[in-house]
């Protein structure tokens, strides 16, 4: 990595301070060592929202634009109230706040602060583990270390987000040393956390290599980026619908995705779909011989999560927004839309722009974001 990664940018506006507060809030909310209380989390959320809204108002948008912002915020606010989580609203407000900003500067800002804060967290977590703290779980006979985060998958998600931000920021100047360094890092964290993120990263690296060597492949990526999310959404729903009917393909996909289809089917057959979201924080599974599990519940798949928990209306909005971003024709952005779509088959972190950054591309298609669109292909200095 370039030595300039050591340089931490100074916050220079309400936007920067708001984003920094949200980075800290996100890491604390996912930490077992420094987990923030509900009150602290709410205070950090309130501070960040005030800062981001102040930045939006400082842009002196016209009444029509502000009304549109208010409508979008209210819609997502209602959804967040329905599901009992403000995470999605934070992403929306962040996207609205950076509408007229240089998105590469914003991503670089997030990358550098997350890199250092997560590195410090992992170092302290590793030392604490060596000193006897149980930041690990025994899973099918092997140990999965979380380095102080609530789950090994959370550690993996943060590392994966850093990796894809790094690739996006250095896209025009990537070299073999970058690939080797990232693969070594991912292999190391695979040994620590025992997650499949390294598999997705390997596919991603191969994808970039093919794109540089094959123009036809580039055209294919542009096409896939437009339709990946609706295709995978439909595929997930069909597999979920067929699971309880004993469909062999559905069960095979379920095994490949480590029970994610089965969990979605369990929820779907008891709750159905939702348009504007529902609160599932207290939803648990009871023993069922067909499904073979009981206890806590999680989706770990964005598409089933949106269909059954968050609301179909949000899924449709994401489909439209990412289609419009893909239609802009930026090969770099389209690669990462596809990465987001594939990664979403195994995680729900993609709805947080601070845990899976490509959702920030939504800012590029907000009406009036001309400066952002003009800059989207600009080549910035390497990080």
What are these regions (language model features)?
Residues 2-30, 41-248, 269, 292-375:
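Hydrophobic transmembrane helix bundles of membrane-integrated enzymes that assemble
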Residues 36-39:
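Interfacial loop-to-helix junctions that mark the boundaries of transmembrane helices
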Residues 249-310:
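Long extracytoplasmic/lumenal interhelical loops at the membrane interface
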Residues 374-383:
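Membrane-proximal cytoplasmic C-terminal regulatory module of class A 7TM GPCRs
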